Amino acid sequence: MEEKELEFAEEWLEVEKYHFKILTIATILADENRAYRGKLSEFCEHIGIQNSSANRTKIKNSLFVLADNDYIRLIIDKDIYTVSLAKSIEKSKNIIKIKKAWYKLIRDNKNTASWENTLKIFLVLLELPNDKAITYEDIGTIVGVKKSTVKNCVATLKKINFKDFVFNIDLERVQLSNGEYRTKGQTYSQMLIFE
């Protein structure tokens, strides 16, 4: 039996926090039901946030921005919202695929790092070339978060037992003229584990 995969467009890594959460949930629901249909209060539950008027307003505004930028299709019938991914995802050249089980492990992990930032950084690390040294700052620039957030997310990812997948992280150091060493960055490689 083939495991289900989720597809994320690389350009989603640059969108705002709420927009990424909504695109992720739309991806999950598109996989299961082809679209999300329900009230904003129910959407709060799917995203994992408190159902409050401020959060519903943020979701509503995010839905409009995503629809205006052709990330999603949005149909509103009174207070029922139907959200599905736009066809533009199918045309995207840079799709990152992950196992649905990996998403669930990241989402269900209770840690200081938010699930959406951890997922974004996971997706970035999957796409990095194995031979290129990169810093937390570089990754933070890609996804629009602070260096400390990247550090927390990488620490979280190292703790997750993916069972069939491991991140190998190596420090890249250079020797200075005075004989001391300085860290240049880290290289990330991924290994699939077969049983």
Task: Kindly give the residue locations of the regions a language model identified.
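Electropositive, intrinsically flexible nucleic-acid-contacting patches
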Residues: 1-195
